[in-house]
């Protein structure tokens, strides 16, 4: 059975979000296969530790073999839970909005919990090497403007960063399924979503065919 981990970084209700509606259509297609197990994580409903002074101090103490405080033990334990869940997945689906040319803060916090030296990448004489080859990442993204073509293509920092950081930990099988332009042409928003749903459905079918 293939494990699909879905990371939702949008706080809106599904019906209020083009990205979440697109994501649900994608996941509905996947769920048609009984050999797929889907696990969902809503970053706005979970405890996602930030890398702060407490965490940095805890890492230093752990490396030196020193005792951790109860708070540090709890925080590092939670970070390890997040990491193990990510490592156990065969496919990771990120559902994100583009906010101010980036994505929500909690997604960056989540990524900081799974990009861990010695676990998901390692340092070598030739440079960093990713350790999570063999997985697939699907990035389902909603953008109000047009960023897939024209003069704004270089501003697609959300997608380029996520693809780069996933490649850094060894996941090079990466796909971006996007819906865009709803704010630029609100009168066509539902039409745009319908077209994106067709692409998302085909993407999900391709994934199912590939993992058979």
Stretches with model-predicted labels:
Residues 123-168:
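Short, glycine-/small-residue-rich phosphate/pyrophosphate-handling segment
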Residues 3, 37, 135-137, 173:
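Residues at the starts of beta-strands that form the adenosine-phosphate
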Residues 89-90, 134, 171:
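Short, well-ordered alpha-helix to beta-strand connector turns
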Residues 149-212:
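Glycine-rich phosphate/pyrophosphate-binding loop and the adjoining helix
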Residues 41, 140, 177:
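Hydrophobic residues at beta-strand termini and immediately following loops
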Residues 13, 47, 146, 183-185:
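Flexible, glycine-rich phosphate/dinucleotide-binding loops
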Residues 1-96, 101-105, 109-112, 116, ...:
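N-terminal beta1-alpha1-beta2 submodule of the flavodoxin-like/Rossmannoid cofactor-binding fold
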Residues 9, 142, 179:
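Cofactor-binding loop segments of dinucleotide-utilizing enzymes, especially the Rossmann-like FAD-
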């Amino acid at each position: 059975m293939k494990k699909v981990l879905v990371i939702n970084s949008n706080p809106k209700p599904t019906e209020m979000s083009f990205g979440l509606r697109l994501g649900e259509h994608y996941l509905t297609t996947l769920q048609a296969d009984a050999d797929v197990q889907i696990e969902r994580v809503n970053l706005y409903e979970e405890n996602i530790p930030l890398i702060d002074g407490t965490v940095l101090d805890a890492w230093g103490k752990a490396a030196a073999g020193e005792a951790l405080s109860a708070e540090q033990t709890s925080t590092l334990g939670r970070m390890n839970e997040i990491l193990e869940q990510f490592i156990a997945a065969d496919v990771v689906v990120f559902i994100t909005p583009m906010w101010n040319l980036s994505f929500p803060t909690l997604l960056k916090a989540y990524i900081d919990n799974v990009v861990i030296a010695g676990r998901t990448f390692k340092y070598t004489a030739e440079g960093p090497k990713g350790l999570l080859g063999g997985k697939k990442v699907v990035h389902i993204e909603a953008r109000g403007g047009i960023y897939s073509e024209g003069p704004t293509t270089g501003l697609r920092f959300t997608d380029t960063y996520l693809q780069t950081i996933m490649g850094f930990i060894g996941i090079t099988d990466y796909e971006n399924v996007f819906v865009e332009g709803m704010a630029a042409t609100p009168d066509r928003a539902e039409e745009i979503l319908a077209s994106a749903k067709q692409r998302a459905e085909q993407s999900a079918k391709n994934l199912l065919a590939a993992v058979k």
